[in-house]
Amino acid sequence: MCMDRLVESYPTGDPGDACRILGPIAIMQADLEEISEFGLQTSIFGRPTPISRLHHTVSSLHHFESGHWVSTYKSRPAAFFFTSGDFHSDQFNKAIAGRRDFVRSCRRGHAERNYSGFSLADGTIIWTLKYVPLAASRCLIFLRVIRMQKFSDQVKEMPRRERRVLETLLYALPFLLAQNLVPAILILKTKKNAVLRYLWIFWSVFVFYQWLQIPISHGESGTYVAKVGVQLFIVILQGFNLVLINPLDRDELLQTKVTGPRDDLLRQVYKVARLFTYLRGVRTPWQVKGIPSHPAYLELQPKTPISRSAFLVRQAAIVAWLYLYLNCANSLADRNSSPLSKPIYGLGYLRVSREEWRTRIMTSLMFWFAFLRAAVDIDYRTASILSVGVGLDAPEDWPPLFGRANQAYTLRNFWGTYWHQMFRWPFTATSNYLARELMALPRPSLLERYTNIFFVFLVSGVMHVMSDLLMGISMSQSASILFFCSMAVGVMIEDAVQAAWTRVSDSHRPGGASTVDSDGYAVPCWHKLVGFIWVCVWLSLTTPAWLCPLQMSKEKSLFLVNIPELVGTRKAIAITVGGGLLVKYTFRGEL
């Protein structure tokens, strides 16, 4: 049964009526047939997939209670469609009227982003490829139906935005538990050379792959899907580090005091699982470099160790302000009439207008020094409030995530001191293994040093490609690997210039005004000024190519409460500025 017949089978022939009568169901079989005839490829979950791999012949429709519909198939499954929630008639009309647009969008490799009718809450499409057993797909149907029926009464009354976010988080929970708990238990219960440890990698990749198979989530929950995907991917790298190449076991954890002799199994599993979630290794022998110290506001408190109440109050105040800031920034960005036009590479920079250069520079600097920092920091501080508030962690386990912006006067300092170090441990462990163990490069040597740096940024690029796929950006559109590998090139250029300057000048004896950097060395102010200009130029050259696909995805607001809509943009900006000053002078906020 194709969509046209589905609509024509109802008296009015109106797709909106068909939608209201049948409930939220739409079968794009006709579109799939058209794509097959044209010999095109459709992009599923951000990856081009030959249409020949899918079967789309529907044999019957089974009606479940509460308006849930599931389509089943004659033979071993290719795919099934299961949709639930609100599917508005205007979206239904748009889906039918835009069939040709849907087909053309497949040629561009991002059909799932242009077709807004299906999402985690408004409708879920789960595609099961040929080689997946029928039993597995039916179990997935059953679990999905049961879960939706259990929560339908509570969730259906929620606003659409909140419902999408809640459903995404509920869906992610078993994935996160499966990915983090299994390696933690393996470390505690197996020896370093156990065969089970080598089998774990298949399990971890399988869990991540299953997360990739969920539909692209539109609108409010798309970023949450990507964040969960990044966490699942990074556990693979950290597990590769702690389970295989630098293996830990229970005895070593006791010796390093990561776990205690009196800890029960649940507490031990939690402490080991933290090594896969909080990747900076705070207060462990593996603590990464570049972690800022706690702010002076907390260190000057009369209580030692840090007062839990003072920590929670300060974190809550900063989280509230970050929410206000991101809310206003997102609202203003939506009104921007001159977004980045397109990615530019090579000699194309010579043809960029002055106005577009201004846009690119301002966008890049605001992105790195304001918006992205705030977006990452708010998640970290929220997690710290939950962990410290329920007593799982101490305030000392949650030092600031970002360093001071005034230290970002070289690319090395930008990435190693100013920017968060959340992924430094698994990235460097992976790069060290590739450069020193697998390639056996001589150490120390320039070749080993810069190969190692290149691998660190390459792994970072791969991780961000995974995030792009979950955001609906195909691999061909993603510029993540190009952007992050360009940082390795920038570091090489920077090191070469610094080495040349050292040879022609007595730079270790600066004259005039100077400041002291994080390593205790005096740095002339003009060196910092030149360095800041260099960092800004390199970021402005490289960042827009990475941001353009993200900007084109046109994701909706992430915020459950939109402050500018409630009080007006001007009042929201005034509240944000006033709140920022209050946080700065009351809690000694640091930038």
Curated annotation (Swiss-Prot):
Keyword Transferase: yes
Membrane topology (UniProt): Multi-pass membrane protein
Catalytic activity: sartorypyrone F + acetyl-CoA = sartorypyrone G + CoA; sartorypyrone D + acetyl-CoA = sartorypyrone A + CoA
GO biological process: lipid metabolic process
Keywords, comma-separated and alphabetical: Glycoprotein, Membrane, Transferase, Transmembrane, Transmembrane helix
First-listed, main subcellular location of the protein, grouped into a coarse class: membrane
Membrane-traversing stretches: 123-143, 168-188, 199-219, 228-248, 309-329, 383-403, 453-473, 481-501, 529-549
Effect of disrupting the coding gene: Impairs the production of the acetylated sartorypyrones A and G, but accumulates the unacetylated sartorypyrones D and F, respectively.
The family this protein is said to belong to: Belongs to the wax synthase family.
This protein's name: Acetyltransferase spyB
Taxonomic path: Eukaryota, Fungi, Dikarya, Ascomycota, Pezizomycotina
Gene: spyB
